[in-house]
């Protein structure tokens, strides 16, 4: 790991994010999956630049049974009328309710990384 990466990690105060970034980078190298390296790079940025995606945007831009990854937080504004699998760093309580009511699943980034090591078929939402 380069010196620049270590500086970015030491600025993070949330130990979960630090370990997630390291795990993502390791998985990107082991599985030759550039999606995990991209997500790690996005999470190294300041948290004020993390994605904040509403349910309404997910509803507009996805089809039934899509798998998406949000490098940030999923918020509960809007309605969801089809099942989707959403992985994110964090979810609001109302977002979890709406996704599960529509028949979808809420996963952490670690869980989707274990389920799909190559990252194929995953859409990144910003």
UniProtKB/Swiss-Prot annotation:
- Annotated GO biological process: translation
Is Protein biosynthesis among the key words of this record? no
Gene Ontology molecular function, alphabetical: RNA binding; structural constituent of ribosome
**Pfam families this protein is in?**
Ribosomal_L27A
What are the record keywords, sorted? Ribonucleoprotein, Ribosomal protein
InterPro entries associated with the record: Ribosomal_eL18, Ribosomal_eL18/eL18-A/B/_CS, Ribosomal_eL18_arc, Ribosomal_uL15/eL18, Ribosomal_uL15/eL18_sf, Ribosomal_uL15_CS
GO CC list: cytosolic large ribosomal subunit
The lineage's top-level taxon is: Archaea
Similarity annotation: Belongs to the eukaryotic ribosomal protein eL18 family.
- Which PANTHER family does the UniProt record give? 60S RIBOSOMAL PROTEIN L18, LARGE RIBOSOMAL SUBUNIT PROTEIN EL18
Q: What is this protein called?
A: Large ribosomal subunit protein eL18
The scientific name of the source species is Methanosarcina mazei (strain ATCC BAA-159 / DSM 3647 / Goe1 / Go1 / JCM 11833 / OCM 88) (Methanosarcina frisia)
Corresponding gene?
Answer: rpl18e
